Amino acid sequence: MPTTTGVQNDILATTLRILRDQLVDSTFKAVPLMDAVNSLGNVEKVDGGSYIDAPVILTDHSMITQLTTGYEAVSLAVKDPLRTASYSWCDAVAPVVLTRKEELSNKGERAVVRIMEARLKQTMGMFKREIEKQIVAGSSTILTDLQTLNGLDAATGWFEELAFGSQGNTVGGISKASFPTSWQNQVQNGSFAANGLKKMQQLLIDCQQFAPEGDVDLILASPISYGLYKDELQQLERYTSATEMRDMAGKLALTFNGASMYIEPNLGFTGSGGVNKMSMYFLNTRLFNIYFDQDAVFELGDMESISGYSAKSAQIALRMQVTTANLSGHGVLVNAET
């Protein structure tokens, strides 16, 4: 027969799981990149595995044969068999804890639920901050197995400040030097005050020219570069519609050639060389995929007693990774902080 404590734990865990579903949705909407990728249906939930093998688009796959008479031999020459980039999972867990003293000090099930709701929100907020820090700047000290766009400091980071065609990082086990026109990001470098809008326009053109599909639809900007862009527009600035903004958790968004631009507080960092600053990311989110293990999408476990302590906890499990099919459709604006 279940104990009273066991029943209370089950009720509490069930209540928290309902709230957890809402918080997962809020986490996606609060991170512009995750929200954009999710809206395109590029969030993949898979059955475990040790690695993620993500298909990439590097060169043309086969050759076209024109049929003039209809009797021409069809060329079956394959220029590029299916290639995959290989990524390790990022595994993480965080507990939501309630002590016996807190239970006794807050009589009534609703009081205890309120405490756990607040702690669940805190924990999910921590996950959100660490995910964003790592993806954007590679600055998380916790989720270091998660891929980062910062190639200034990480040899496996996606985006470098070097000219297109001369980059040397390794992403997903594939050397960028091996595919200089498809596995390297676009770059523009220089002061925003000098000709920032022209550099943004050129970066957009470069990304569109080399992208195998889609266009730049998301721009993440450091607070300073965002402010400089906003000042430059003056009376010409255009905001996204209320309809497009309603699900973005109140985030302010300008647009540039149809791409939504958001303030990203983790940008504006200086690379380890002490010279270059990452100011803006131009992203083609159609080329992104976010993978989750279907059993660890911020999965909330049961409330269990902690051995040796007068407390109980439920653990939130996360297993995820970020991938891209192509790098040449993305770009960075460097040193646009003045």
What is each PLM-predicted segment?
Residues 57-82:
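N-terminal low-complexity, intrinsically disordered segments
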Residues 2-64, 85-338:
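Core alpha/beta structural scaffold of self-assembling particle/tube/pore-forming proteins
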